[in-house]
Amino acid sequence: MSTATHKLLKGATGDWEMVIGMEIHAQVTSNSKLFSGASTAFGGEPNSHVSLVDVAMPGMLPVINEECVRQAVRTGLGLNAKINLRSVFDRKNYFYPDLPQGYQISQYKSPVVGEGEVLVELDGGRSVTVGIERLHIEQDPGKMLHDQSPSLSLIDFNRCGVALMEIVSKPDIRDAEQAKAYVTKLRSIMRYLGTCDGDMEKGNLRADVNVSVRKPGGPLGTRCEIKNMNSINFIGQAIEYEARRQIEILEDGGQIEQETRRFDPDKGETRSMRSKEEAHDYRYFPDPDLLPLEFSQEFVDELKAKLPELPDQKKTRFVADFGLSAYDASVLVAERESAVFYETVLDKLGDRARDGKMAANWVINELFGRLNKEGRDITGSPVTAEQLAAIIDLIGEGTISGKIAKDLFEIVWQEGGDPRALVESRGMKQVTDLSAIEKVVDDIIAANPDKAAQVKDKPQSLGWFVGQVMKASGGKANPQSVNELLKSKLGI
């Protein structure tokens, strides 16, 4: 059930609504290709991971890779989708130099996964449910290289035959924000499942985006497809541009041509590639070299029983068990590695219920803040979960103050080391000796008689005195003791 309001675009004739559907091409995580034993490793020398099957040598027959089927079924289960116990591989016929067979082995009428849905969270606590039409398995074609020779186009077949999952959404997406959030959520689910690494820079996750516009609540318009998007930000830019392009044409009295377009990131615009093909243009028919794919319900149930905890389930648990806000829990579970880091911190602290909120604050505000500033991800964090847990522990037991903890975090970030040993060796322990704190308090009050006289009328100025005492003590004074002493001496 959608709770999201969506963005309408203003035109000369009033508001327009976007209608967006997406086809996500996700490379299956497996050691070998869909129908051959060739390696799927990224970055090899051109044409070094190629078998005779991949390049369609005469007499070579495809043999299905069971692991790819397992990964597709696991993904379908993660999308709350219907798993079809019988599916069929079809030949999708078209000519392109990077497709040596002259056809692509795909699935048309009988895909391995049927309808499902994904809950997509948006800013401000809003959400939208995007329906999944189907998930089918197909071969990736090769890669054409046009910049290696002034007169030739070269082909690298390393990618040819690698297993792809094509995840087709229903046209439930209504603006660029929802589209970006949908791709982000799909990628997160597949990373949790281990079925696709989602690395868009390597081409392991690509999106075809279908965009049309209409008057709100009106009939669906003619759609254009933007091909091979490999960046979430570019997806957002392409949708905005394409929708406005269509609105301008319609408001000028023109008609939208159904076509395939590509996005030019340098100019921020879409450009026509070719007219959009219909299914009959591909002359689909069942592949005679492959039997129908059949498996039992027990096979599906066994895979379902072994699924890991997925982002939505983990978020619900974090809110219930650790008292986190829905927002904080969403941030922590967005990437599997972030959730693992957070739970490792809690394991080291020992009392999950007690320390959950404090650990979340440190992970989100201090750690993630610093990682984002330096353009790193959690796997490249200089501060380990064990080190962060030790810092939080030192605060909890009163050994250091929150301010000193931030200084300690900076030292560990830059130099590494054991936080407890650093506190000892650098004299960073919190001062809890009341007589020592009292002397500093007395000195601050004596140096500011006017402010001290006004504090009864302006109780909020107590914070200024606390700040001065903490500054004078180098941040080492126990904040609770400072507050109590100041209130006593100032008569508040």
Swiss-Prot record:
Recorded GO MF terms: asparaginyl-tRNA synthase (glutamine-hydrolyzing) activity; ATP binding; glutaminyl-tRNA synthase (glutamine-hydrolyzing) activity
* InterPro entries linked: Asn/Gln-tRNA_amidoTrfase_suB/E (IPR017959), Asn/Gln-tRNA_Trfase_suB/E_cat (IPR006075), Asn/Gln_amidotransferase (IPR018027), Asn/Gln_tRNA_amidoTrase-B-like (IPR003789), GatB (IPR004413), GatB_C_1 (IPR042114), GatB_Yqey_C_2 (IPR023168), Gln-tRNA_amidoTrfase_suB_CS (IPR017958)
- Reactions it catalyzes: L-glutamyl-tRNA(Gln) + L-glutamine + ATP + H2O = L-glutaminyl-tRNA(Gln) + L-glutamate + ADP + phosphate + H(+); L-aspartyl-tRNA(Asn) + L-glutamine + ATP + H2O = L-asparaginyl-tRNA(Asn) + L-glutamate + ADP + phosphate + 2 H(+)
Where would one find the signal peptide in this protein? none
Q: What are the protein's UniProt keywords?
A: ATP-binding, Ligase, Nucleotide-binding, Protein biosynthesis
Residue ranges that the Swiss-Prot or TrEMBL entry lists as coiled coil = none
Q: What is its EC number?
A: 6.3.5.-
Q: What biological function has been recorded for the protein in this entry?
A: Allows the formation of correctly charged Asn-tRNA(Asn) or Gln-tRNA(Gln) through the transamidation of misacylated Asp-tRNA(Asn) or Glu-tRNA(Gln) in organisms which lack either or both of asparaginyl-tRNA or glutaminyl-tRNA synthetases. The reaction takes place in the presence of glutamine and ATP through an activated phospho-Asp-tRNA(Asn) or phospho-Glu-tRNA(Gln).
Q: How is the quaternary structure described?
A: Heterotrimer of A, B and C subunits.
Q: Which family does it belong to?
A: Belongs to the GatB/GatE family. GatB subfamily.
Q: What name has this protein been given in UniProt? A: Aspartyl/glutamyl-tRNA(Asn/Gln) amidotransferase subunit B
Organism of origin is Bradyrhizobium diazoefficiens (strain JCM 10833 / BCRC 13528 / IAM 13628 / NBRC 14792 / USDA 110)
